[in-house]
Amino acid sequence: KKTYFNKNSLKIISVGRLVDQKDHMTLLKAINEVKKKIRISLLIIGEGNNKKIINEFISNNNLEKSVKLKDYTKNPFPYIKQADVFILTSKFEGLPNVLLEAIALKKFVISTDCPTGPNEILDGGKGGLLFKVGNFLDLGKKIQFFKNNYKLCKKKNYYAQKQLFKYDSSNNLNKYYKNIVEF
């Protein structure tokens, strides 16, 4: 089974287009900060016009051994399953399906507290960790928190998994149908 992660490291994954909205630079800056304290292996899956800037940052900060890029894949689940934590760094989102998918795959989530989506999915932080949009130092602290508080984070992840039914389309359709019938 092919892996993009280094052994004996904290395995982090991020999946999303390599564009300004997804703000991968915040993630890379956070990794650059915490790499001095924690052995990290990061896989970013996606394609987009920021790929060159991302590769330059990786090269300029000697992150080649810690950070790998993989082009878009229709099914990122096998890669997400190999990770310890999923990180979303978006400046804004609608309903980030990839966050729901990561939780369904029992991955702990660290996400930006961007307008709409992550805060609701993570129930204000009860189901994962939230950090300020664009704040790589805050993200770095959250990564360290995960590494140092694994049992607590496992409980948060379990809470998030129990909340997933809210986003099940058949469950939502049943609610709408019930409302229509009662109307």
Predicted regions and their residues:
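A conserved mid-protein helix/loop that constitutes part of the nucleotide-sugar donor-binding site
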Residues: 10, 14-33, 49-55, 97, ...
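Aromatic "clamp/platform" in nucleotide-sugar-dependent glycosyltransferases that forms part
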Residues: 72, 91
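A short alpha->beta transition loop at the rim of the catalytic pocket in nucleotide-sugar-dependent
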Residues: 77, 84, 106
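Short hydrophobic beta-strand element within catalytic cores of glycosyltransferases
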Residues: 108-112
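Conserved acidic donor-binding segment of nucleotide-sugar-dependent glycosyltransferases
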Residues: 123-136, 144-150
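C-terminal alpha-helical cap of glycosyltransferases
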Residues: 145, 169-183
